[in-house]
Amino acid sequence: MKFSAVILAAGKGTRMYSNMPKVLHTLAGKPMAKHVIDTCTGLGAQNIHLVYGHGGDQMQQTLAEEPVNWVLQAEQLGTGHAVDQASPKFEDDEKVLVLYGDVPLISAETIENLLDAQPTGGIALLTVMLDNPMGYGRIIRKNGPVVAIVEQKEATEEQKLIKECNTGVLVATGGDLKRWLAGLNNENAQGEYYLTDVIAAAHDEGRAVEAVHPVNAIEVEGVNDRAQLARLERAFQSMQAQKLLEQGVMLRDPARFDLRGELQCGMDCEIDANVVIEGKVSLGDNVVIGAGCVLKDCEIDDNTVVRPYSVIEGATVGEECTVGPFTRLRPGAEMRNDSHVGNFVEVKNACIGEGSKANHLTYLGDAEIGQRTNIGAGTITCNYDGANKFKTVIGNDVFVGSDSQLVAPVTIADGATIGAGTTLTKDVAEGELVITRVKERKITGWQRPVKQK
């Protein structure tokens, strides 16, 4: 369906009490405006015109990669004025969809319904029934059809009783919309050019106005302050959780789950409370994610258990692995099948081979570890000399004793043993035992220091 979209995003957002433009505040880890842009892109919008004003430099920096035409509204003179700034870009015969950068949950299904409902030469208008319509423009009907919209400040006491409200979202043909916008005036309580006045202009020309309701009322709720943003966050997360439950993912507490990206799950996955998913995450079959974990841009294969409070970012984890609790896998970390990392272990840009283990208090950076190797508690790969990074290579069936420092670049061949407390600076041959401790001394009669009085 051929259409273009105008997204109004010029408002300052005073009630957010922030130096950041309102539409850049995030919902589910993504700027509100980007939610709307992504929905339009997914529907195949030919053009997306983003009308901006306050914080323009910040807007353009944050959304630099988005496929939008930037339209400046230098003075905020109302919604009609905002849309009119983009009107020179409208094609006369295309459908033009008007959306809002601070209404992030509008769904593709609702937009499709609205586009389909537009009468020839007329307007399709998204309206919603509200028990408490305070602050919203009211829909005025005459013997059924919509004939006008009256803003809250312009409404009579009788009109204020109307529960059908304007969402501001509409579809009109480009040529008609340009003509109606050109005829707007600002003779109202706000001294602004209201987009809503195009409804009366269309009616005066005998054009039909078709009202459409959203699939869910929450879709058309806007954000003016942080409390409203928090409400939409929870509503969005609830919808995400419901979809995952319907797909067979066991969320132990759907109310305490946050999806801030994309999640693909195999069969019989289980996710405990307070887990946060960011970026693109893939879970295989029978994966268990413990409470309080954060997963970002990672892949976790079948039958792996991630114990509570682990952080995995930019990493790949094989089958039958165990991670955590309190493990951090940083970008470039790779765990091969049946490997294990435990509490307070950090892995960065390192590969842990099949069947290998680092169960306690360890840092593995810029390292390659073979199969069936055991890394003792307190082991550190010393990969950085203050200027450059160096690699540690550890072979198969190696045993590294506790509290060892492996000063890279260094290679430990298959079957070698590193004694506890070793500071290793030279390569180790296959099967060798290395111990670098000083000779043990015993001092009899030694007295501990005492505090001076």
From Swiss-Prot:
Enzyme Commission designation:
2.7.7.23, 2.3.1.157
Residue ranges of the region described as Linker: 227-247
The name on file for this protein is Bifunctional protein GlmU
Region N-acetyltransferase, as annotated, extends over 248-453
Question: Quaternary form?
Answer: Homotrimer.
* Signal peptide per UniProt: none
- Record-annotated residues binding Mg(2+)? D102, N224
Q: What is the lineage of its organism?
A: Bacteria, Pseudomonadati, Pseudomonadota, Gammaproteobacteria, Vibrionales
The cofactor named in the record is: Mg(2+)
**What catalytic activity does the UniProt entry give for this protein?**
alpha-D-glucosamine 1-phosphate + acetyl-CoA = N-acetyl-alpha-D-glucosamine 1-phosphate + CoA + H(+); N-acetyl-alpha-D-glucosamine 1-phosphate + UTP + H(+) = UDP-N-acetyl-alpha-D-glucosamine + diphosphate
InterPro entries referenced in this protein's UniProt entry, alphabetically: Bifunctional_GlmU, GlmU-like, GlmU_C_LbH, Hexapep, Hexapep_transf_CS, MobA-like_NTP_Trfase, Nucleotide-diphossugar_trans, Trimer_LpxA-like_sf
- What's the record's note on cofactor binding? Binds 1 Mg(2+) ion per subunit.
Single Gene Ontology MF annotation: magnesium ion binding
Query: Which key words are in the record?
Result: Acyltransferase, Cell shape, Cell wall biogenesis/degradation, Cytoplasm, Magnesium, Metal-binding, Multifunctional enzyme, Nucleotidyltransferase, Peptidoglycan synthesis, Repeat, Transferase
* Positions bound to UDP-N-acetyl-alpha-D-glucosamine: 8-11, 22, 73, 78-79, 100-102, 137, 151, 166, 224, 330, 348, 363, 374
Purpose? Catalyzes the last two sequential reactions in the de novo biosynthetic pathway for UDP-N-acetylglucosamine (UDP-GlcNAc). The C-terminal domain catalyzes the transfer of acetyl group from acetyl coenzyme A to glucosamine-1-phosphate (GlcN-1-P) to produce N-acetylglucosamine-1-phosphate (GlcNAc-1-P), which is converted into UDP-GlcNAc by the transfer of uridine 5-monophosphate (from uridine 5-triphosphate), a reaction catalyzed by the N-terminal domain.
Residue positions annotated to bind acetyl-CoA are A377, N383, Y384, S402, A420, R437
Q: Where in the cell is it found?
A: Cytoplasm
| Family statement | In the N-terminal section; belongs to the N-acetylglucosamine-1-phosphate uridyltransferase family.
Question: From what organism does this protein derive?
Answer: Vibrio campbellii (strain ATCC BAA-1116)
Q: What SUPFAM superfamilies does the record point to?
A: Nucleotide-diphospho-sugar transferases, Trimeric LpxA-like enzymes
